Amino acid sequence: MPVHATPAAESQIISMPEWRRTANFKPSVWGDRFANYAEDIITQTQMQEQVEELKQVRKEVFTNAADDSSHQLKPIDEIQRLGVAYHFESEIDQALERIHETYQDIHDGGDLYNVALRFRLLRRHGYNVSCDVFNKFKDTNGDYKKSLVTDLSGMLSFYEAAHLRVHGEKLLEEALVFTTTHLQSASAKSSLLKTQITEAVERLLKTMERLGARRYMSIYQDEASYSENLLKLAKLDFNWQCLHKKELSDIP
């Protein structure tokens, strides 16, 4: 009896899956950095526009304060602490030149905070200014006045200025001991002051400037002179990772 082979219905044909060995690939050291790069081009452009806008606003602040050089001390210090001083190099240089020109005229004026801040900014930028301006804060016995201890912002400013001493400046050597002793005592009672001192030390150490800038952002928003635009600029500048991605994408 002949056997007839009948083709199986199409619905009855079962395709067996083709099994392949799974390769055990190690994760890329680059992660997904390049996967998102195209989307970041627009973001980078938008961020650049915002940075330029914020820089323009801050330039207006320099212009408004130009009539009184002492009013520029605080903005310059804030800009440097926030790590965005390179955006305003010409404005800062011009302002410090004016401040230096009147340095002798205000030799005996100002409170501890402003005298120390003026001294620190000028000396840090290479001006040869005398530390004799701090003699006015000593008593008849040659010691720093005890009344200064309650001026914490002034003491912190003085502490930072003392780090810019040169060999043989006994006034500043004594100032460093004086401020360190009293600030350590006060910081034990104030977490904010402790944070400010830590930020100051980090900023004095060149290798930790960016870390100091990040820490100061949280301090700055509570300052009386707080500028929302300046803080935005600092945050954008700190978080600007798009440029780093672009540099990586250029690697052959």
UniProtKB/Swiss-Prot annotation:
Keyword Acetylation appears in the UniProt entry: no
InterPro entries found in the cross-reference section: Terpene_synth_N, Terpene_synth_N_sf, Terpene_synthase-like, Terpenoid_cyclase/PrenylTrfase
Name of the protein in question: Putative pinene synthase
PANTHER family: (-)-GERMACRENE D SYNTHASE-LIKE ISOFORM X2 (PTHR31225:SF251), OS04G0344100 PROTEIN-RELATED (PTHR31225)
Pfam name, any one: Terpene_synth
Organism: Fragaria ananassa (Strawberry)
Family: Belongs to the terpene synthase family. Tpsa subfamily.
GO molecular function: terpene synthase activity
SUPFAM superfamilies the UniProt entry points to: Terpenoid cyclases/Protein prenyltransferases
Protein keywords: Lyase
GO biological process, one term: terpenoid biosynthetic process
Additional free-text comment from the UniProt record: When compared with the genomic sequence of the wild strawberry, an insertion of two tandem cytosine nucleotides in the middle of the coding region caused a frameshift that was followed directly by a stop codon, leading to the potential production of a shorter, probably non-functional protein.
